[in-house]
């Protein structure tokens, strides 16, 4: 979870237009993107951290994770 949270921090630093959050509801992790006007979108959801990580990497590429290491 720590690496995933660091990746979210780097996504928020690199993407000045949007903010990204992970929340947990009913046992599922939900990745949410919120734009500068306050509108939010569910980008993806999964029941484990590994799948959320794959969603982030699938959408934004490995750059987000490499910048954290």
Report residues per predicted region:
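Acidic, low-complexity, intrinsically disordered interaction modules
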Residues: 17-63
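Negatively charged, low-complexity tracts enriched in Asp/Glu with abundant Ser/Thr
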Residues: 1-17, 63-69
